[in-house]
Amino acid sequence: YITMNPGYAGRTELPDNLKALFRPVVMVTPDLGMICENMLMGEGFQMSKLLARKFVILYRLCQDLLSAAPHYDWKLRAIKTTLYVAGGLKRDQPHLTEDKVLLQALRDFNLGKLTSDDHGIFMGLLNDLFPGMLADVPRQRDDAFEAQITKSAIELG
């Protein structure tokens, strides 16, 4: 099984003599809503239909409204990774409601890759989709990692 998607960074086009050895198959665009819903169900979410709808809306809006930074990925690979993160958070923090778990996963997983210009837009989108919940959802913190970063920054000046 070989995919021909040279659009991702680091990939190159296959030469024509190698392309001729493979049978071409065409696939349609996947139904991201259905994939999200099923993955959320698989991770134990009861409100999977509603949360999947919010998830897909957010990623589509991010694709349309945020800058076209080359490191942004709002497609299936990023969706699946974020949903796995949400499942882990659900298991680690059973006291949080499902919408807060998904909000935390979306915020914490994506904020680090956003440019400063896109940060406010993204937070606004989250606030629109999860009204009034941002302040109630704790940030995942790694105190040991943060301490090491602070120490290194001080040492380097």
Question: Where are each of the predicted segments found?
Answer:
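Short regulatory helix/loop adjacent to the ATP-binding pocket of P-loop NTPases
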Residues: 7-21
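Alpha-helical lid/collar subdomain of P-loop NTPases
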Residues: 1-4, 20-157
